[in-house]
Amino acid sequence: MSPFAPFDAQTQVLLIDDDPHLRQALRQTLDLAGLKVATLDDARQLDTAQCKDWPGVVVSDIRMPGIDGMELLRQLHEQDADLPVILITGHGDVPLAVQAMRGGAYDFLEKPFPSDALLDSVRRALEVRRLVLENRTLRLALAERHELHGRLIGRSAGMQRLREQVGSLAAIQADVLVLGETGAGKEVVARALHDLSSRRDGPFVAINAGALAESVVESELFGHEAGAFTGAQKRRIGKFEYANGGTLFLDEIESMSLDVQVKLLRLLQERVVERLGSNQLIPLDIRIIAATKEDLRQAADQGRFRADLYYRLNVASLRIPPLRERGEDIPLLFRHFAEAGAMRHGLTPRELDAGQSARLLAYDWPGNVRELQNAAERFALGLGLSLDDGVLPDAADEPHNLSAKVEAFERSLIAAELERPHNSLRSVAEALGIPRKTLHDKLRKHGLPFNTPGENPPDDGE
């Protein structure tokens, strides 16, 4: 017996009863009331896994062969605990119906019952269902909004606009072009678009076209058959095919050769992929999110990028503002990354003083969020407020030479270990992997007191 799935948006009432005369009479009543009805004579035909978020009502007899109304109620509520189920009982089945109500049934009707009683119960159940699903939608929207705030951090107008755009584009299936400088967070945006979409349970495949050698880029993206070229000893599934059913994030798309761009354009238009060495077209159900740090329009004008591919990609685009355009977000982001870094290493979070905060805002951040994250994590480790290109201006309290940096790092590690729960110098020394006397010498050198009741300095011979 093949499963029957009437759980579509058009069906309002699913009626299940093994008595053909009663089933026909009840259907006629519901039809005349303008309700869209589907009927079954056996609950075993039903695919209950499809009922989640269905906007309708189930009306079922309790006494049926195979799966009775009580078992059906249990199976439906395993999938959606709020689905309204109205049970029909015969004379003498009232105790069973009361048990069903306690088990989550919406209502029960004792035979014989007037048509108005059925219609009234169904209409009330439909209204309750509408409100439940509306509430679910609102809660989901709030949860997604909260998740977006956690991923795309910032109070600036640019970030607020970006979050709104991501939320809107996540709900549709269109391919997206993400524009942003190096380190701006293009993959973070792409991942958010995937995770908030209907494809969230499918694969998310990220590939950087700029990191692929010209000789392997086509094989990596489109795949190949055994013998397609020298060295192709077995079939390879390409990234596009691997991402089928999900999302493929293609970064640095501007680095692709014109020949590969032609193949990508065909894939975007026809939604098929052809492995190297094969004539078979493989259908794809895929969303492509491309990203670039360049002006593709200018690249197209210069002949470095296909104009038709640019126009095909630029239907839906997002621009991530560089960090220098959203200075108000810098302290917030720095604190977020510094606290995360401290937590990861088991350290107590450090606080920026006013001077350090001012230096953060004065810096241009050419590496954007990636550079800021690196600086914040170094700060969390006690390595000072420095960048890849050197110490920030006015950071006179930070070490400049290698020896001083090593000393500062050693001090930060010991200080961090001292903040952990220890009851003796010996346990601290063991945690650091050094003798207790060495630890005592370093505590004295770095000015780090450690006072434990009964703890005495080690003897020279220890």
UniProtKB/Swiss-Prot annotation:
One GO term under biological process is:
positive regulation of DNA-templated transcription
Spell out the molecular function terms from Gene Ontology.
ATP binding; ATP hydrolysis activity; cis-regulatory region sequence-specific DNA binding; DNA-binding transcription activator activity
Under the heading CDD domains, the entry gives: AAA (cd00009), REC_DctD-like (cd17549)
Instruction: Name the GO cellular-component terms.
Output: protein-DNA complex
After translation, how is this protein modified?
A: Phosphorylated by DctB.
Q: Which InterPro entries match?
A: AAA+_ATPase, CheY-like_superfamily, Homeodomain-like_sf, HTH_Fis, HTH_TyrR, P-loop_NTPase, Sig_transdc_resp-reg_receiver, Sigma_54_int
Record-annotated Sigma-54 factor interaction domain positions: 152-381
Q: Which residues form the Response regulatory domain?
A: 12-126
Which Gene3D superfamilies is this protein grouped with? 1.10.8.60, 3.40.50.2300, Homeodomain-like (1.10.10.60), P-loop containing nucleotide triphosphate hydrolases (3.40.50.300)
Task: Give the residues the record marks as binding ATP.
Answer: 180-187, 243-252
- Known function: Member of the two-component regulatory system DctB/DctD, which regulates C4-dicarboxylate transport via regulation of expression of the dctPQM operon and dctA.
Q: What is this protein called?
A: C4-dicarboxylate transport transcriptional regulatory protein DctD
Q: Which organism is it from?
A: Pseudomonas aeruginosa (strain ATCC 15692 / DSM 22644 / CIP 104116 / JCM 14847 / LMG 12228 / 1C / PRS 101 / PAO1)
